[in-house]
């Protein structure tokens, strides 16, 4: 089977619009959660979200500006979730050193997903429909809002003509997208895949819908809103952004002298077949994804140096994922450090797994495991080695990252230091 390595990374996140900014924010324990600015929340119980900061002044280079990554005309024909994906893909390509002039474009593919697509486009055009009639609907509404346009726009902007897929598995989208990119290279369907996830759903209907599910935190304190594994957790905080990585067949990467960050060695998936929003209570579905990934990677539970948990800060997810980790890793579960990146960036939905995968690769590169920022006290059954207060500096060889999505989707990746 062909080996698959990571040679480039790109990120747009609530704590930084590049991988370096994101990782420096992670190491500093920066929390990207603040009051929602995209719309008036007067009538909403939820006041907080982790937003990518909008452009206010041209000099504020930390703010996202689509025109830094594409021309104005292209940007106007994309919704934010597509813009974020293209921006992250551009950074990943630059980071990888891949020169498409020297590549067979049909051997370079895309696996980028979005859990939702554009709710904002649907909302604004629904308003036009009600107020002015169907003739005023934007003729580009459908290609603006559908989830596959993130992958489509990455392909168009970067000239990638190979396999192009759009995975939609709710909150597992980013991890599944990277996993399917990995499989595509393993099985010879591509030599290079741009893989990841993207999301921009902080809108009235997005916040309103998740709030109606009672899935969102109603905390008014940004530091205590997204607190995975804490006994006072009361829901997730919606985030937005994108993460894209360049996956490459090992010999292809070596031949062109690429810098190799890490190697993917295992990918596992399962379905709970249980409930539309809740994970399986005993954790058996997620545990199967973990054990499948470990089996393919040929690693034992004792070999896992770090688990980047799905850790959403909801009561059910964090408890049931804890049970799943215990089922999958047995006695070793109590020793391995566990943390959730969502404690700092919120829940990026379809982008979550991709951004968290980048955090895992950086953990391997830097020998650093970030904490669960805001974690104060856990409950009785939550007795794993959750990283608390300060990060851990240690050699990190093998990392497991988990994602669980509405509908019972479970996905796990094993990424390890390249040797």
Indicate residue ranges for each PLM-predicted region.
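Conserved small-residue
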Residues: 8, 26, 89, 110, ...
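Glycine-/small-residue-rich "gating" segment that lines the acyl/pantetheine channel
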Residues: 131-138, 179, 183, 199-255, ...
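Acyl-CoA/ACP chain-elongation machinery
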Residues: 189-234, 267-281, 311-318, 335-385
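Condensing-enzyme catalytic core mediating Claisen C-C bond formation in acyl metabolism
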Residues: 3-7, 34, 221-297, 306
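Conserved beta-ketoacyl condensing-enzyme motif
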Residues: 6, 27-169, 198-207, 301-317
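ACP-dependent fatty acid/polyketide chain-elongation machinery
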Residues: 1-74, 251-261, 358-372, 416-419
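Active-site-proximal alpha-helical scaffold in enzymes
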Residues: 85-98, 147-151, 155-199, 237-258, ...
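Phosphate/pyrophosphate-binding loops at sites that engage ATP/ADP/AMP, CoA/4′-phosphopantetheine
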Residues: 92-104, 253-258, 290-306, 328-332
């Amino acid at each position: 089977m062909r080996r698959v390595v990571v040679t480039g990374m790109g990120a747009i996140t609530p704590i930084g619009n590049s991988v370096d900014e994101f990782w420096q924010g992670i190491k500093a324990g920066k929390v990207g959660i603040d009051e929602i600015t995209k719309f008036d929340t007067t009538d909403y119980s939820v006041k907080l979200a982790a937003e990518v900061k909008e452009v206010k002044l041209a000099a504020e280079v930390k703010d996202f500006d689509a025109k830094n990554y594409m021309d104005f005309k292209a940007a106007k024909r994309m919704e934010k979730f597509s813009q974020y994906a293209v921006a992250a893909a551009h950074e990943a390509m630059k980071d990888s050193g891949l020169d498409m002039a020297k590549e067979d474009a049909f051997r370079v593919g895309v696996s980028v997903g979005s859990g939702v697509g554009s709710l904002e486009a649907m909302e604004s055009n629904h308003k036009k429909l009600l107020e002015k009639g169907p003739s005023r609907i934007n003729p580009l509404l459908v290609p603006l809002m559908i989830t596959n346009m993130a992958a489509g726009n990455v392909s168009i902007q970067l000239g990638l003509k190979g396999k192009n897929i759009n995975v939609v598995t709710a909150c597992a989208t980013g991890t599944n997208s990277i996993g399917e990119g990995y499989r595509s290279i393993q099985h010879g369907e591509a030599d290079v895949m741009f893989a990841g996830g993207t999301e921009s759903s902080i809108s009235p209907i997005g916040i309103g819908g998740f709030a109606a599910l009672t899935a969102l935190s109603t905390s008014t304190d940004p530091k205590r809103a997204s607190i995975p594994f804490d006994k006072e957790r009361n829901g997730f905080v919606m985030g937005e952004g994108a993460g894209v990585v360049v996956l490459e067949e090992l010999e292809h990467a070596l031949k062109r002298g690429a810098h190799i960050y890490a190697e993917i060695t295992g990918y596992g998936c399962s379905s709970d077949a249980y409930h539309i929003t809740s994970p399986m209570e005993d954790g058996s579905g997620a545990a199967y994804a973990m054990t499948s990934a470990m089996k393919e990677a040929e690693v034992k539970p004792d070999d896992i140096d770090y688990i980047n948990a799905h850790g959403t800060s909801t009561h059910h997810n964090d408890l049931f994922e804890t049970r799943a980790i215990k089922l999958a890793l047995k006695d070793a579960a109590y020793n391995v450090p566990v943390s959730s990146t969502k404690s700092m960036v919120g829940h990026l939905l379809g982008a979550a797994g991709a951004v968290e995968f980048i955090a895992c690769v950086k953990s391997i590169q830097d020998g650093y495991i970030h904490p669960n920022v805001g974690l104060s006290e856990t409950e009785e059954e939550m007795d794993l080695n959750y990283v608390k207060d300060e990060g851990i500096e240690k050699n990190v060889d093998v990392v497991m990252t988990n994602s669980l999505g509405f509908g019972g989707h479970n996905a796990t990746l094993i990424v390890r230091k390249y040797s």
